[in-house]
Amino acid sequence: MVCTRKTKTLVSTCVILSGMTNIICLLYVGWVTNYIASVYVRGQEPAPDKKLEEDKGDTLKIIERLDHLENVIKQHIQEAPAKPEEAEAEPFTDSSLFAHWGQELSPEGRRVALKQFQYYGYNAYLSDRLPLDRPLPDLRPSGCRNLSFPDSLPEVSIVFIFVNEALSVLLRSIHSAMERTPPHLLKEIILVDDNSSNEELKEKLTEYVDKVNSQKPGFIKVVRHSKQEGLIRSRVSGWRAATAPVVALFDAHVEFNVGWAEPVLTRIKENRKRIISPSFDNIKYDNFEIEEYPLAAQGFDWELWCRYLNPPKAWWKLENSTAPIRSPALIGCFIVDRQYFQEIGLLDEGMEVYGGENVELGIRVWQCGGSVEVLPCSRIAHIERAHKPYTEDLTAHVRRNALRVAEVWMDEFKSHVYMAWNIPQEDSGIDIGDITARKALRKQLQCKTFRWYLVSVYPEMRMYSDIIAYGVLQNSLKTDLCLDQGPDTENVPIMYICHGMTPQNVYYTSSQQIHVGILSPTVDDDDNRCLVDVNSRPRLIECSYAKAKRMKLHWQFSQGGPIQNRKSKRCLELQENSDLEFGFQLVLQKCSGQHWSITNVLRSLAS
């Protein structure tokens, strides 16, 4: 689960730290800031409810771009020698693990903690020293404590998926589920081990399971894969082993809060075609303190990375913080009627490893007659790792899975996914596998169109049907350089070594606008940035602002021809500048015959 609350676009520039060998590549990645100033929660007393105030349009955004730029720019940089004192410095001095924790540890303790942190992505050293039954603050809205629920609710099977999880973290997940789920509602716990190599997860875990099962025979089941199948297929393995009417599918680094189960089971009992997500809080990866997260719906951008969204306006109008939140998608952990999950098609096992399955499930459920909700009265704390140790880069898997979703479920809007990933719509070169069965499932379930989904379920999502060309933009004078958004704070486009990632995505529209950078996913996000002639200088300005101010944002362009501003008649061209890293800068000047080309053309680029 890699969704976070807020991101800031970073630049695609690499910097060598003076006197050090570290190369910092500032990419378009999720640089996390909190959407709402959060409080580290230490006490057990519930905080008073905050008055509900509708967010005025600052949607909580995604984190996760793990592309690596080093390979495409290494020819332009050289490793700087380390200073002797830096070479002798302790390896843990710059680790984020010790920013807010561990100052009192001995050097040996720090080394051990850092080694475990690098392996797990969170502070396993601290986790091993925390009690399994530690108390959690009750972060539910106060109204949740006054709700009543039916006496007769369906039982639930809780499934935990893991690979090489720290044993103490896994056991705390199990223990919190047992302690904070009413015994008459929790039928069993199922552990799906996706072929872990960690020895602790074999003998010691077996000892723990045997101890529990000696008191409650068959209560904990363990499913062990003989090879790694990935998160998606592991969830399905857990579902297959479950026997309760309701199945809860979770990561194995969570802690359940009091009263989480009753609201969920009540909503599913009322309508078995509802898939439910709890509201999530954060377990800080470094000090394991609980950070309260604001209530949110769950959605996605056009690359199909998951994102937290503001609750819809209809929810705010209720002025009831306990009300279910209608959600376009899921972020990975969810609770579902066991039989309905099978009827709707489980998860797409043709997907690989991780990513996109949560979006696909949400789209499928909505289009095929079900619904998705987030419940404010059901709260789960979840560790957001500092890094994912089980894979170096999730991007390739998410991209492949996203294209698979697009081809099955998104109709004419599948083009948006290809555009967001900067991939040709024909002959993409990416094998998405056989989707025949998934298309047959859609037909069998008589599902609605994706346009219906956008209009009825996810109206916040921006549509980009006016884009007629996209990709990287190159000049004939220097073809190894591409137009790049440059430093985000300066709004000045630059020419940079071509790498084809988000900062170099260019979109040309039928209204002759040139968008540079990410396709803004929703109407609540910051607007797209358009290329504008500002006092004879190229600048990137929010498109809506530039249009409202009647700025010079329209450009005549045809493939292999000049890019000329329609009002000023100046052309976007390259000019040599030896002071710049790559020797060229972008200028607006009298047209001299320079030509531009863009990677993918959808319709004719008539000037």
Swiss-Prot record:
Cofactor requirements of the protein: Mn(2+)
EC number: 2.4.1.41
Region (Catalytic subdomain A): 153-267
Residues that hold Mn(2+) according to the record: D251, H253, H382
Ranges per topology, Lumenal: 36-607
Region (Catalytic subdomain B): 324-385
Annotated pathway: Protein modification; protein glycosylation
Listed Pfam families: Glycos_transf_2 (PF00535), Ricin_B_lectin (PF00652)
Domain of life: Eukaryota
Residue runs in coiled coils: none
Disulfides per UniProt: C144-C377, C368-C447, C482-C498, C530-C543, C571-C591
Localization per record: Golgi apparatus membrane
GO molecular function: carbohydrate binding; metal ion binding; polypeptide N-acetylgalactosaminyltransferase activity
Main location: Golgi
Signal peptide: none
GO annotations of cellular component type: Golgi apparatus; Golgi membrane
SUPFAM superfamilies: Nucleotide-diphospho-sugar transferases, Ricin B-like lectins
UniProt domain Ricin B-type lectin: residue ranges: 469-599
Annotated positions binding substrate: D194, R385, Y390
BP GO terms, sorted: protein O-linked glycosylation
Sugar attachment sites: N146, N195, N320
Cited PROSITE patterns: RICIN_B_LECTIN
Family annotation (PANTHER family): N-ACETYLGALACTOSAMINYLTRANSFERASE (PTHR11675), POLYPEPTIDE N-ACETYLGALACTOSAMINYLTRANSFERASE 18 (PTHR11675:SF37)
Entry's free-text remark on domains: There are two conserved domains in the glycosyltransferase region: the N-terminal domain (domain A, also called GT1 motif), which is probably involved in manganese coordination and substrate binding and the C-terminal domain (domain B, also called Gal/GalNAc-T motif), which is probably involved in catalytic reaction and UDP-Gal binding.
Family, as annotated: Belongs to the glycosyltransferase 2 family. GalNAc-T subfamily.
Record protein name field: Polypeptide N-acetylgalactosaminyltransferase 18
